[in-house]
UniProtKB/Swiss-Prot annotation:
The gene is obg. GTP binds at residues 169-176, 194-198, 218-221, 288-291, 316-318. This is GTPase Obg. Monomer. GO terms for cellular component: cytoplasm. Its main location: cytoplasm. It comes from Nitratidesulfovibrio vulgaris (strain ATCC 29579 / DSM 644 / CCUG 34227 / NCIMB 8303 / VKM B-1760 / Hildenborough) (Desulfovibrio vulgaris). Its cofactor is Mg(2+). The lineage of its organism: Bacteria, Pseudomonadati, Thermodesulfobacteriota, Desulfovibrionia, Desulfovibrionales.
Length: 366
């Protein structure tokens, strides 16, 4: 499926059913009292996050969504049926923005809790039947309420992938090979830059405890100026905002002997320019493709990193060398760093059984 991380949709909740204007009519009871039932409430539009989806592609294909209307009330005090709710499943980590008529946006939901749901458009309340208005002073009310219209909203959906670890690096650093080594992900791998055009997700399973898992996001290669839109990284930098930590991979081919860690510093600067908080995010620094250099050259780099106080892992993702040490470090970080809090907490909204502010009545002839 094509990866899509933004979409705009229109949602409309169902209209409440009209209340019924009816009187009891039976043999030998010429003046039966009112017996009009209430209309059913309209169905609501509900958003439910799920980890089964990784793209908003379906919401690019279909943009309009409507819940069912409530049925009108009937005689003999029969209430109308409530309209069926429309439940839309969205990828876990989706941000929901309401867009007004002038194009202004306001975030209304952060779907980062797999057990949470959000009522984005509430169905209209059903109108009261004339039996509801019977009183000691009004024995035969000849009016009933109409149902309320359902809420309508225009929404912009923005997916920010929820992952434990984010893989970063310059193009052709070997991130895709690395993620294919440690998980069941099978991204496209080739010896040219920008092989990865969209984020790939992999799940690493603990060999001792199969229920212990780590989700890893392979972010497309970043280049200098990514925060301003250069290269491919500009669109995907947002996907690292919610990771617990980052795994920064640098190809040994990109190392300058005079200043070997420039590649790490360049990407870190791009992260900071995109969001200053990312500068402080925990990182694991990895030099990949050590099989392309002699053991003596690799040892010299190890010593230089140690002298400068940098803990850097040296690996060959192609041949599996050094992978186990990186994986152990990733598990340690995953277990010590909490997932980031949602930007907007979902709140349960209690339905209030209140009267209509403005009663719209339907009269019958005398």
């Amino acid at each position: 499926m094509r990866f899509v991380d933004e979409a705009t949709i229109n949602v409309r909740a169902g209209k409440g059913g009209n209340g019924c204007l009816s009187f009891r009519r039976e043999k030998f009871i010429p003046r039966g009292g009112p017996d009009g039932g209430n209309g059913g409430d309209g169905g609501s539009v509900i958003l439910r996050p799920t980890n089964r989806l990784l793209s908003l592609y379906d919401f690019r294909l279909q943009r309009n969504y409507e819940a069912r209307n409530g049925q009108s009330g009937m005689g003999s005090q029969c209430d109308g049926r409530k309209g069926e709710d429309l439940v839309l499943e969205l990828p876990l980590g989706t941000l929901v923005f309401e867009v007004d008529d002038e194009g202004h946006e306001q975030m209304i939901a952060d779907l980062s809790d797999p057990d949470g749901v959000f009522v984005v458009a509430r169905g209209g309340r059903g109108g009261k039947g004339n039996e509801h208005f019977k009183s000691s002073t009004m024995r035969a009310p000849r009016f009933a309420q109409k149902g309320e219209p359902g809420e309508e909203r225009r929404l912009r959906l923005e997916l920010k992938i929820l992952a434990d670890a984010g893989l970063l690096g310059l193009p052709n650093a070997g991130k895709s090979t690395f993620i294919s080594r440690i998980s069941a992900a099978r991204p496209k791998i080739a010896a040219y830059p920008f092989t990865t055009l969209t984020p790939n997700l992999g799940v690493m399973i603990d060999e001792v405890d199969p229920d212990r898992r780590m989700v890893i996001a392979d972010i497309p290669g970043l280049i200098e100026g990514a925060h301003t839109g250069q290269g491919l990284g500009h669109r995907f930098l947002k996907h690292v905002e919610r990771t617990r930590f980052l795994v920064h991979i640098l190809s040994i081919e990109d190392i300058d002997p005079e200043n070997p860690w420039t590649g790490f510093d360049l990407i870190n600067e791009e992260l900071a320019r995109f969001d200053e908080v990312l500068r402080e995010r925990e990182q694991i620094e990895v030099v990949n493709k050590i099989d392309l250099r002699t053991p003596e050259e690799v040892d010299a780099l190890r010593q230089q990193a140690a002298q400068q106080g940098r803990r850097i892992f040296f690996i060959s993702a192609m041949h599996g060398e050094g992978i186990e040490e990186v994986v152990d470090a990733m598990w340690r970080l995953r277990d010590t760093i909490d997932m980031h809090e949602p930007l907007v907490h979902l709140q349960e909204v209690e339905e209030e059984d209140e009267e209509f502010e403005d009663i719209e009545v339907v009269y019958t002839r005398e």
